[in-house]
A protein has these predicted regions:
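Conserved phosphate/oxyanion-binding catalytic-loop motifs
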Residues: 54-55, 59-65
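Histidine-anchored nucleotide/phosphate-binding helix
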Residues: 4, 8-24
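Active-site-adjacent betaalpha module
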Residues: 4-8, 50, 84-85, 93-94
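A short beta-strand-loop structural module common to alpha/beta enzyme folds
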Residues: 23-34
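Structural motif
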Residues: 5-8, 28, 57-58, 96
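Short, conserved loop/helix-junction motifs that constitute active-site signature segments
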Residues: 17-20, 43-50
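C-terminal structural segments of small proteins and small subunits
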Residues: 66-96
Length: 96
């Protein structure tokens, strides 16, 4: 399953619905939670054990965040990568 998370803060209820093996893309203001020095970094580290996490490059750029500032293990993708993920995942949940 693919989860698209759009806003910050990210509710605990959303995180509880992410199963092992799911893929998660952070978009829009949700990218603000991905900083390696942020308060959310421990939660991200736990998710990364069983899930692949992605962030849209354009959303980082708009907010002045570089890939070097992200929690290790988060993959930066472009719109083509997002399309590939939507095609490869039969079920998609959008959280906004």
């Amino acid at each position: 399953m693919l989860h698209l998370i759009f806003k910050s803060p990210i509710a605990t209820a959303i995180l509880e619905r992410i199963a092992a093996g799911d893929e998660v893309v952070f978009l829009e203001n949700a990218v603000l939670r991905l900083l390696h020095k942020g308060s959310f970094s421990d939660v991200l580290a736990q998710l990364l054990v069983q899930n692949r996490l992605y962030v849209l490059a354009e959303d980082l750029e708009v907010r002045g965040i570089s890939a070097d500032e992200l929690t290790n293990g988060i993959e930066v993708i472009d719109y083509a990568g997002l399309v590939d993920l939507t095609v490869s995942n039969p079920a998609i949940l959008s959280w906004s």
